[in-house]
Amino acid sequence: MAGENVRDLSLCISGLVPESKLVSFDVAISSNQIGDTDLKRAIDPTWLHSQQNDDRLIIHALPINYSIDGNSGIKDPRGMHCGKLGVNMHVITTSIRAVKNITACVNRCHLDVDSQILGSYAAGLACLVEDEKELGVVCLDIGGGTTDIAVFYDGELVYTDAIPLGGTHVTNDIARGLSTTLSFAERMKT
């Protein structure tokens, strides 16, 4: 690893800027049998961009499950026959201005942003095992000023949010409650 130059990086987005919502979309299947091209057409983010505000950037469009002719809950519909393929997606957007500002800062360091990932999603992928995500789990990423939340169920990320309370707030509460210094409260917290 020593002597390597980093040129590209993935931008981790967290805090109160990202928004999470569930969307559904249907596409007609002309061949009656669902193939890879039909799945790509169903999860194509092009139609999502037409639904978004100009000030939002889609960072994740994650299929949760599919439906065929109105029958939902299907994980992998390839090879099945239907006239209409539906997809339920978890779409996560963020402020395009915030991403542009952070990207400009990164570019000034002679680096390029290769991709963006939601911080709580990345934390869940790094910390959780498949069984936990399958059974259902909440991953909390407690930062200094915010707590990021990622909910996994049936192996998929189904909800994300952030609340404006973090570790700094806990430290301040300990310091006030015990009438002590912030540094001592920080040591007590850990």
Please provide the spans of the model-predicted regions:
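Nucleotide/phosphate-binding catalytic cleft detector across ATP-hydrolyzing
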Residues: 1-139, 156-158, 181-190
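Residue-level detector of high-confidence beta-strand sites
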Residues: 160-162
